[in-house]
From Swiss-Prot:
It is an enzyme of class 2 (transferase). Pathway: Pigment biosynthesis; anthocyanin biosynthesis. It comes from Rosa hybrid cultivar. This is Anthocyanidin 5,3-O-glucosyltransferase. Sequentially catalyzes two glycosylation steps at the 5-OH and 3-OH positions of anthocyanidin. Unglycosylated anthocyanidin or anthocyanidin 5-O-glucoside, but not anthocyanidin 3-O-glucoside, can be used as glucosyl acceptor. Pfam families: UDPGT. The gene is RhGT1. Its EC number is 2.4.1.-. Belongs to the UDP-glycosyltransferase family.
Length: 473
């Protein structure tokens, strides 16, 4: 395998892997002299409560890698050994960070074989455990941040918050001010950042510190989409009193459509719906709702009168009436029958990229995961923002108040969204003047995303700077 070697190490989650693969493909398209190696791994299934979900995710990872390898033989996947057993002391929440730590000996072997041609290692943020090791070995180390630029602005401020407050709760009712961002309510910050005694928090603190010391941060975004946040990052306003590493925006990176999905029932159904008429509801691989919440969602959709395509996952395992319940067992009685002329409910999965690119889809109820947001923006689909976990509440603030490409649901203190609330937001998006304005803004960003990846576009230029940096080493 010749050429200057670039090694990419993604976290073993499908969304993280897809973004890394798309980065590798982009590099080879514009700079084919590089040799791309992706370190592929699967997550351990030793935690009983999540074993089934993780095993299913691992199967998806394996199938995805096979498909990519067949279509892109220039990308080399190096399969790391599966970590079959975990130390008992590992904090469950910190598992994503710890898993990378356990892989260090295996990764060092790979890096050693590429030593003479290795130009850079690109880490997922959850793979931060490699940073100190690679710096000691003088390997140029970059981070590929799979979330938004505005989320990075928050992440880089964590050491400052840690130094100047005892807890994020110290802000009280005063919104948090971060350069390049609208005012952030404390309630929108990820809950896991409030407890500083956990290893998870300590890992986040370490990651944000290391990112600031890295050779550069690569972002799956484009300049027009996050203009204010990116200007603040590049101006060093998010890292006071120390230099900011170079910021490279190379997006939007989203996976292409697969002809293998053309026969999926959701696409066949969409073929028979009017243009821009369908609301698509999908909440990612971890988007699990209680039966009570599913029932409220169903009633809200029914009352809205809108056409819908809804991906429904099973409720939490402790709520399951049987291992694989029917829709009738988890949705209101008669709902599927009453709405069959304008709605389709599919179980567990639908080909999201293909669905969002379909002419019939006119709205997207999303958990605000960044990959999903980019897919919607690139296809000109406006959103209803319904965050569930991690940094997604920050995403809602950004999508609704900064970008103005979404309407946001309002949940109770326990996170419950009523049927009336969902009905109201779906109607607002699909059938109002404000919804039309949102649709227009998304269309502008969609066009901007296309231009960013054309020759002379901002993302192609940013990628060229990155490649030049590696070639000079």
């Amino acid at each position: 395998m010749g050429g200057d070697a670039i090694v990419l190490y993604p976290y073993p989650g499908l969304g993280h892997l897809i973004s890394m693969v798309e980065l590798g493909k982009l590099l080879l398209t514009h700079h084919p002299s590089f040799s791309i190696t992706i370190l592929a791994s699967t997550a351990p299934t030793t935690i009983a409560a999540t074993a089934k979900l993780v095993a299913s995710s691992n199967d998806q990872l394996t199938n995805y890698i096979k498909a990519v390898s067949a279509d892109n033989p220039a990308i080399n996947f190096h399969h790391l050994p599966t970590i079959s057993s975990l130390p008992e002391h590992i904090e469950k929440l910190n598992l994503p960070f710890e898993y990378a730590r356990l892989q260090i000996p295996n990764i060092l072997q790979v890096l050693q074989t590429l030593k003479s041609s290795l130009k850079a290692l690109i880490l997922d943020m959850f793979c931060d455990a490699l940073f100190d090791v690679t710096k000691d070995l003088n390997i140029p180390t970059f981070y590929f941040y799979t979330s938004a630029g505005r989320s990075l602005a928050v992440l880089l401020n964590i050491p400052t918050f840690h130094r100047t407050t005892n807890s994020l709760s110290d802000f009280g009712d005063v919104p948090i001010s971060i350069s390049g961002m609208p005012p952030i309510p404390v309630s929108a910050m990820p809950k896991l950042l409030f407890d500083r005694s956990t290893n998870f928090y300590k890992s986040f603190l370490s990651t944000s510190t290391h990112m600031a010391k890295s050779n550069g941060i690569i972002l799956n975004t484009f300049d027009l989409l996050e203009e204010r946040a990116l200007k603040a990052l590049r101006a060093g306003l998010c890292l006071p009193n120390q230099p900011t590493p170079p910021i490279f925006t190379v997006g939007p990176l989203i996976s292409g459509k697969s002809g293998d999905n053309d026969e999926h029932e959701s696409l066949k159904w969409l073929n028979n719906q009017p243009k821009d008429s369908v609301v698509f509801l999908c909440f990612g691989s971890m988007g699990v709702f209680s039966i009570k919440q599913l029932e409220a969602m169903a009633l809200g959709l029914e009352k809205s009168g809108q056409r819908f395509l809804w991906v429904v996952r099973n409720p939490p395992i402790e709520e399951l009436p049987v291992e694989e319940p029917s829709l009738e067992e988890i949705l209101p009685k008669g709902f599927v029958e009453r709405t069959k002329d304008r709605g389709l409910v599919v179980r567990k999965w639908a080909p999201q990229v293909e669905v969002l690119s379909h002419d019939s889809v006119g709205g997207f109820v999303t958990h605000c995961g960044w990959n999903s947001v980019l897919e919607a923006v690139c296809n000109g689909v406006p959103m209803v923002a319904w965050p569930l976990y991690a940094e997604q509440k920050l995403g809602r603030v950004f999508l609704v108040e900064e970008m103005k490409v979404a309407v946001g649901v309002k949940e109770s203190e326990t996170g419950f969204v009523s049927a009336d609330e969902l009905e109201k937001r779906v109607r607002e998006l699909m059938d109002s003047e404000s919804g039309d304005e949102i649709r227009g803004r998304v269309s502008e960003f969609s066009n901007g995303g296309v231009k960013a990846k054309e020759e002379g576009g901002s993302s192609v230029a940013s990628l060229a700077k990155l490649a030049q940096l590696w070639k000079q080493k």
